[in-house]
């Protein structure tokens, strides 16, 4: 019987200008379903975390916009992968049809008979304007806006741009990809009759923590941009709207704007913290210290045997989000659900763990005011005397609870539901940032993570005395562990959560700014 050809589909999707929160819901849905993602170098890497693990992530252009492979090669790859039955997302910075060459790819797909869909994105111009504080149209300032290429087809002998028409344009001009031609663009606009006092600005890395905005006039902006040594990607804005920046600028006022922060949580738990950092104007750098994985299959029967005896325990104690997730995964695997916990009271070490329990329909009966094992143990020693307590835990961790509870006559049993392993080394990017000082902060969320951070520094031949990266600790216990390793802790969270770490960094920066 002849095989049936199954054709996939290609989604030409806009990723927005940089901030990962600006991707559309439709594009995010397609990323989650994709078999393959081909993305531009201008795409924020955090967006790739929305894809499934089987996706091949292959950059087609570099961050500075230079080409790795030709447009023809990209077209051929899209067609070949779709013919192989794959769902392909072609992810482009900004909008696919606004100087994104998306229409060329769509035409190639149409000619080859490949189904495709175009998903608009927030344009780079829109993102740059609104994150920099420019309103391109305004009743009293500008009735029109023009998007203009600053980098035309290099194979053409003559320019298609009519600078005399642009000089007369009754509104805002936005030039894409024009930083290297900034002086020439300003010269031609002035030569065509636009006043040299016309406000102008350059926006680099729009909507990212590394965003830079330089403003001036047509006469001064080339020198100002050169003085700041601006780099692509960038846009040039020409028009009266540039004067609005003093009034409308908001992004640079965010409390963590321009601050890079190392997120040391396990990779699969880093996204929520990364989103918090982005919303505060910062740049998350995901650098997990430990890897979390399931227990070995031979150890699973012991977990199942414990589930047979859940009715024997008066208390269940959860000391991590991972412990909650893995406990309920094994519980469901055994054919049980939350009703199996009806006889026990539940203790959680912190709000994050308690919230994770709530996601499974369980309200914690007790959460200590101070999110430390010592506080949890002291409270349980009073509440659970003579009772059976099951501690759901990882293969490694602090062993404070057993001593505290057993001394109080509590019958403690430990149930290991997941493994945690140290990562082998920092990535090369993290090492480079630590050595260059471009990673400004790192958050340490447990004593074991503090010790592992110190160990990886040693492996990378970075000595604590040379480290310019500031350290924020989630608790005094974690701070002491860091101090024991020779690390200097800049601040300690009042609330022992990652939100507490970020709040501590904000407070530390404000205090430093006040004293400087």
Q: Predicted regions: what is each one?
A:
Residues 1-20, 25-122, 127, 227, ...:
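Class I S-adenosyl-L-methionine
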Residues 43, 151-152, 179-181, 204-209, ...:
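Glycine-rich beta-alpha junction loops
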Residues 35-37, 57, 135, 173, ...:
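Short, well-ordered beta-strand core segments
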Residues 4, 18, 64, 70-74, ...:
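Signature of uroporphyrinogen-III synthase
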Residues 32-42, 199-204, 346-350, 470-475:
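Short internal beta-strands
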Residues 93-169, 214, 366-372, 428:
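Class I SAM-dependent methyltransferase SAM-binding "motif I" and its flanking Rossmann-like core
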Residues 155-201:
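Conserved anion/nucleotide-ligand pocket segment
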Residues 12-14, 90-92, 119, 148-149, ...:
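Short beta-strand segments
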């Amino acid at each position: 019987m002849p095989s049936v050809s199954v054709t996939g589909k290609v989604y030409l999707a806009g990723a927005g200008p940089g901030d990962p929160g600006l991707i559309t819901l439709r594009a995010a849905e397609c990323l989650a379903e994709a078999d393959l993602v081909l993305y531009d170098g201008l795409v924020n890497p955090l967006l790739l975390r929305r894809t499934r693990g089987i996706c091949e992530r292959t950059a087609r252009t570099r961050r500075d916009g230079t080409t790795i492979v030709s447009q023809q090669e990209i077209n051929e790859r899209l067609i070949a992968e779709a013919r192989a039955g794959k769902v392909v997302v072609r992810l482009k910075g900004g909008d696919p049809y606004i100087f994104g060459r998306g229409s060329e790819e769509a035409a190639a797909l149409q000619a080859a008979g490949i189904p495709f869909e175009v998903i608009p994105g927030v344009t780079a111009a829109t993102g740059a304007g609104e994150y920099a504080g420019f309103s391109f149209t305004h009743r009293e300032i500008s009735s029109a806006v023009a998007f203009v290429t600053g980098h035309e087809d290099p194979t053409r002998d003559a320019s298609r741009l009519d600078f005399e028409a642009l000089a007369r344009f009754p509104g805002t001009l936005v030039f894409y990809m024009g930083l290297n031609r900034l002086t020439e663009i300003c010269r031609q606009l002035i030569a065509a009759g636009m006043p040299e006092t016309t406000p102008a600005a350059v926006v680099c890395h729009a909507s990212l923590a590394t965003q830079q905005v330089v403003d001036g006039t047509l006469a001064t902006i080339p020198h100002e941009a050169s003085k700041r040594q601006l780099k692509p990607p960038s846009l040039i804005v020409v028009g009266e709207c540039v004067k609005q920046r003093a009034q409308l600028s908001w992004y640079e006022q965010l409390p963590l704007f321009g601050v890079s922060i190392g997120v040391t949580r396990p990779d699969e738990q880093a996204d929520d913290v990364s989103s918090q950092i982005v919303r505060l104007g910062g740049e998350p750098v995901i650098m997990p210290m430990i890897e979390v994985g399931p227990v070995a299959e031979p150890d699973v029967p012991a977990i199942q045997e414990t589930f047979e005896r859940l009715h024997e325990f008066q208390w269940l104690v959860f000391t991590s989000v991972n412990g909650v997730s893995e406990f309920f995964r094994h519980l469901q695997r055994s054919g049980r659900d939350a009703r199996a916990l009806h006889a026990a009271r539940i203790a959680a070490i912190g709000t994050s763990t308690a919230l994770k329990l709530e996601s499974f329909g369980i309200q914690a009966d007790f959460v200590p005011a101070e999110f430390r094992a010592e506080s949890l143990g002291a409270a349980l020693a009073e509440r659970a005397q003579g009772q059976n307590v099951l501690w759901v835990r990882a293969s490694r961790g602090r062993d404070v609870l057993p001593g505290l509870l057993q001394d109080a006559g509590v019958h403690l049993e430990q149930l290991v539901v997941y493994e945690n392993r140290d990562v082998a080394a920092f990535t090369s990017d993290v090492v480079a940032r630590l050595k260059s000082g471009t990673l400004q902060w790192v958050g340490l969320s447990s004593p074991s993570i503090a010790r592992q951070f110190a160990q990886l520094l040693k492996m990378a031949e970075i000595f604590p005395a040379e480290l310019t990266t500031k350290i924020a600790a989630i608790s005094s216990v974690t701070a002491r562990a860091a101090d024991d390793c020779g690390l200097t802790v800049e601040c300690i969270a009042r609330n022992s959560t990652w939100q507490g770490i970020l709040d501590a960094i904000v407070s530390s920066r404000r205090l430093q700014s006040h004293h400087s």
